[in-house]
Structure formats: structure tokens, C-alpha cells
Amino acid sequence: MNSIDPRAIIDPSAKLADGVEVGPWSIVGPDVEIGEGTVIGPHVVLKGPTRIGKHNRIFQFSSIGEDTPDLKYKGEPTRLVIGDHNVIREGVTIHRGTVQDRAETTVGDHNLIMAYAHIGHDSVIGNHCILVNNTALAGHVHVGDWAILSGYTLVHQYCHIGAHAFSGMGTAIGKDVPAFVTVFGSPAEARSMNFEGMRRRGFSDEVIHVLRRCYKIVYRQGLTVEDALKELAEPAAQHPEVELFRQSIVSSARGITR
């Protein structure tokens, strides 16, 4: 059974699964679907087309699925898709996509999006990510699984943040961040790898040692990216984690943060 506060406004076309809660003064607009067990707090605005999965919690004053302010957007029917088990804290804004890209903004599963963070149009957030307070992603940004973006991190449009990457507080990212890499500063500079995060997630000492050596190949030996990638070929063939690191460099369109 759903629990809908009588002061909430639910459009007749919205689809709410069993066990959904909607708090007072929240607005669930047309073409919004909310999955089982999701809790919508007070003063939340949900605009469609938006699909929200199961067992999410969205806190007060968040605006989810609003039109993008991108000037090329002309009212086309784009969408937002949010997975399961996400926590979206106070004042978060997430915009739908544009037809010039995939026409979809995507948020995966088990993410923590903290207060006043912004996810721009056409962005793709993986699983188990943390966006700390006031993190702001421009349009078309991709964030890999398990990445952590500390408070006030700013990410330029089209940047890719690799899996398990980490940014320090107030970092301004203008280029791609390879998987596992830790960046700090404005503009961002690579400082190390997220070894503490790896240990917490159960990476073996052997894998951490190999990744440390691979980081030095890319960032400490003065090699060009092309030459560094050649050096990574052998360990990448032996360790999928190194291949993830290597591939995040190979696929970079904006160039990697150095």
C-alpha cells in the first residue's frame, strides 16, 4: 500500500508501484514512474519522462527530471532513468537528456548523491558512486562505478571519471580522470591512486602493488601517453584491474588529467 500525503500533488498519468511514500507538498508530474518502496520526501518536484527504480530515497527540495537549461534543448521528449537503492539528499538537481546525445540522463544503483549536488543533462552515473555536497557535473559527464567526488568538485562537460577514481574537495576537473586515479586542485592534477578505496573494497595486495607500479609508468617516468600504454600492455593482459586502468586512458577523448 502507498502512503501519499494529502497535500502532495500526483498527476493522474504518474505510475506508482506498491509501497511508495510521497511527502507533503511534493509534486509528481506527468509520465513519472516510481518503483516499489521508494520514499519521496516533502517539497520534492519530479518531472517526466522520468523512471525511478526501487527502494530509493529522495529528500526535500530536490528537483528531479527538470528540463535542461542547455540552449540547444527545444522541448523534445527526453528522459531521466534512475536505478535502485539510491539516496538523493536535500536540494539535489538532476536534468533530463538532450536529443543531440542519448536523450537520456542515467543514474545507476546504490549511489549516494549528497546535498545540493547537480547532475547535468545526458550524464551517466554508474553504481556505488558518492557525489559529496555541492558537487556539480556539467552535461555529458560519465562517472564510473565506485568513484567518489568530494565536496565542491566541478566537472567540465564531456569529461569521463573512471571507476574507483577520487577527487579532493574543491577540485576542478577539465580532462578525463583514469580509473583508480586520485586528483586534487584547480585545475585538477593527478596525485596518486585511490589505494585506500581499493583496500576497503577488498583488492588484494598484489593487485594494489601492480596498480601502483602502473601509475608510476604513466605519471612518474616522463613517458608520452602512447609509450606508457605500450608499457601497460603486459600487466594489463595479466590483471583485469590494470586493463580497466589502461582502457580508461585509451578511450579518453579529452585527454587525461596529468
Swiss-Prot record:
Its EC top class is transferase
**EC number in record:** 2.3.1.129
CDD domains per the record? LbH_UDP-GlcNAc_AT
Q: Name one GO molecular function term.
A: acyl-[acyl-carrier-protein]-UDP-N-acetylglucosamine O-acyltransferase activity
Catalytic reaction list: a (3R)-hydroxyacyl-[ACP] + UDP-N-acetyl-alpha-D-glucosamine = a UDP-3-O-[(3R)-3-hydroxyacyl]-N-acetyl-alpha-D-glucosamine + holo-[ACP]
Xref: Gene3D superfamilies:
Hexapeptide repeat proteins, Udp N-acetylglucosamine O-acyltransferase, C-terminal domain
Record-level GO BP terms: lipid A biosynthetic process
Q: In which pathway does it act?
A: Glycolipid biosynthesis; lipid IV(A) biosynthesis; lipid IV(A) from (3R)-3-hydroxytetradecanoyl-[acyl-carrier-protein] and UDP-N-acetyl-alpha-D-glucosamine: step 1/6
Please give the InterPro entries that the UniProt record associates with this protein.
Answer: Acetyltransf_C (IPR029098), Acetyltransf_C_sf (IPR037157), Hexapep (IPR001451), Hexapep_transf_CS (IPR018357), Lipid_A_LpxA (IPR010137), Trimer_LpxA-like_sf (IPR011004)
Q: Where are the transmembrane segments?
A: none
Please give the chief subcellular localization of this protein. Answer: cytoplasm
Q: Which GO terms describe its cellular component?
A: cytoplasm; membrane
Q: List where in the cell it is found.
A: Cytoplasm
UniProt entry keywords in alphabetical sequence: Acyltransferase, Cytoplasm, Lipid A biosynthesis, Lipid biosynthesis, Lipid metabolism, Repeat, Transferase
Q: Is the Metal-binding keyword given for this protein?
A: no
Q: Name the PROSITE patterns on file.
A: HEXAPEP_TRANSFERASES
Quaternary structure (record): Homotrimer.
Q: What does this protein do?
A: Involved in the biosynthesis of lipid A, a phosphorylated glycolipid that anchors the lipopolysaccharide to the outer membrane of the cell.
Which family does the record claim for this protein? Belongs to the transferase hexapeptide repeat family. LpxA subfamily.
* UniProt-recorded name of the protein: Acyl-[acyl-carrier-protein]--UDP-N-acetylglucosamine O-acyltransferase
Which organism encodes this protein? Pseudomonas putida (strain GB-1)
The encoding gene: lpxA
